[in-house]
């Protein structure tokens, strides 16, 4: 699995909703209507992550959940991260 170039990541960001690249990581924060809705979102993403064996870092702050994607094994953003970002967009709106 190869790390994507800056140009490849920039191109992919055009098709993603609310994702930003910061410090070599893709990040998206989503504010949910309730704390429990955020927890349910984490569960849904966790199920998908298990299916594809690619796990985001997840931060929960009351109703705001932040998903961070990077392929730690290669030290950068890969196609797996882009695919997971698309999966998260499909779950919670693109």
UniProtKB/Swiss-Prot annotation:
A GO molecular-function descriptor: 4-alpha-hydroxytetrahydrobiopterin dehydratase activity
Cross-referenced SUPFAM superfamilies: PCD-like
Residues modified as N-acetylalanine: 2
TM helices/strands, residue ranges: none
EC identifiers of the protein: 4.2.1.96
Gene Ontology biological process terms in this record: tetrahydrobiopterin biosynthetic process
Top-level division of the source organism's lineage: Bacteria
Cited Gene3D superfamilies: Transcriptional coactivator/pterin dehydratase
Annotated catalysed reactions: (4aS,6R)-4a-hydroxy-L-erythro-5,6,7,8-tetrahydrobiopterin = (6R)-L-erythro-6,7-dihydrobiopterin + H2O
Matching Pfam families: Pterin_4a
UniProt keyword terms in alphabetical order: Acetylation, Lyase
Record-stated family: Belongs to the pterin-4-alpha-carbinolamine dehydratase family.
HAMAP family cross-referenced by the UniProt entry: Pterin_4_alpha
Alphabetized PANTHER family for the sequence: PTERIN-4-ALPHA-CARBINOLAMINE DEHYDRATASE
Protein name: Putative pterin-4-alpha-carbinolamine dehydratase
Taxonomic lineage of the native organism: Bacteria, Bacillati, Actinomycetota, Actinomycetes, Mycobacteriales
């Amino acid at each position: 699995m190869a790390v994507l170039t800056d140009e490849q990541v920039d191109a992919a960001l055009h098709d993603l909703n609310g994702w930003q690249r910061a410090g070599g990581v893709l990040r998206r924060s989503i504010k949910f209507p309730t704390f429990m809705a955020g927890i349910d979102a984490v569960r849904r993403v966790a199920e998908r992550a298990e299916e594809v064996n690619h796990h985001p870092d997840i931060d929960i702050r009351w109703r705001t959940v932040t998903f961070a994607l990077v392929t730690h094994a290669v030290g950068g953003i890969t196609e797996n991260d882009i695919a997971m970002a698309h999966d998260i967009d499909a779950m919670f709106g693109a």
